[in-house]
Amino acid sequence: MAKKSTEKTELDFENTLQQLEAIVTRLESGELPLESALEEFERGIKLAHLGQERLQQAEQRIQILLQKSDSAKLSDYQAEE
């Protein structure tokens, strides 16, 4: 269990993304045995969630900073479909 908390504090967004991209590359190669592919996939899901948490934290920090400053307004992001 200590590994999870240590992992969360050690990985910043860039490292999380880099590891996730490496996992995707290995999975897309099709050369991993099934059990290894499942383990990599599970790790990738955890990294994706961690990356989402990091992005949400950054967005919250930006919103707080902009609320403190009347000179800039934050508008909601509209994804193109």
UniProtKB/Swiss-Prot annotation:
InterPro entries, sorted: Exonuc_VII_S (IPR003761), Exonuc_VII_ssu_sf (IPR037004)
HAMAP family tied to this protein: Exonuc_7_S (MF_00337)
Protein name (record): Exodeoxyribonuclease 7 small subunit
Reaction catalysed by this enzyme: Exonucleolytic cleavage in either 5'- to 3'- or 3'- to 5'-direction to yield nucleoside 5'-phosphates
One Gene Ontology cellular component: cytosol
Organism: Pasteurella multocida (strain Pm70)
SUPFAM superfamilies for this protein: XseB-like
UniProt KW keywords: Cytoplasm, Exonuclease, Hydrolase, Nuclease
Pfam family, one: Exonuc_VII_S
Enzyme Commission number, as recorded: 3.1.11.6
UniProt subunit comment: Heterooligomer composed of large and small subunits.
Keyword Nuclease included in the entry's annotation: yes
One of the record's GO molecular function terms: exodeoxyribonuclease VII activity
